[in-house]
């Protein structure tokens, strides 16, 4: 489902329709962010997860977790196995944007960061 009209690719996002798909045990993929400027796809993911009352956010990205600094740029980056929302924001970590983390915090949504570069992480 998409936030902007791309009828040849996917149906438009309508919350109640997405809920009905899930009730029928269908897989629903949300694409194209929120359709609004200034909101990242990370924020859109947390927003949609909140709307759908999801239990968790799974973020596939280039790195295999949260680091104290970008491991692609810094060889001495240290992996952080677990971090609170507040510490994530205070340490200015960038794997997800602050708006997404703040919204996840407000909703109590846990987030798992995993690498999409590792084929064993993709089902």
Language-model segments: residues:
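A short acidic/basic microdomain associated with nuclease active sites
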Residues: 1-2
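Active-site phosphate/oxyanion-binding loops
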Residues: 5-27, 37-123
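Short, acidic/hydrophobic/Gly-rich beta-strand patch recurrent on exposed beta strands
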Residues: 30
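Short glycine-/small-residue-rich Rossmann-like dinucleotide-binding loops
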Residues: 33-34
């Amino acid at each position: 489902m998409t936030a902007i009209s791309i009828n040849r690719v996917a149906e438009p996002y309508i919350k109640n329709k997405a809920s009905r798909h899930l009730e029928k045990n269908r897989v629903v993929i949300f694409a194209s962010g929120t359709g609004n400027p200034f909101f990242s796809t990370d924020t859109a993911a947390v927003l949609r997860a909140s709307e759908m009352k999801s239990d968790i956010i799974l973020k596939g990205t280039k790195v295999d977790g949260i680091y104290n600094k970008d491991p692609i740029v810094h060889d001495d980056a240290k992996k952080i196995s677990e971090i609170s929302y507040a510490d994530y924001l205070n340490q200015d970590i960038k794997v997800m944007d602050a708006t997404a983390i703040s919204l996840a915090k407000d909703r109590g949504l846990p987030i798992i960061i995993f690498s999409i570069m590792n084929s064993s992480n993709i089902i």
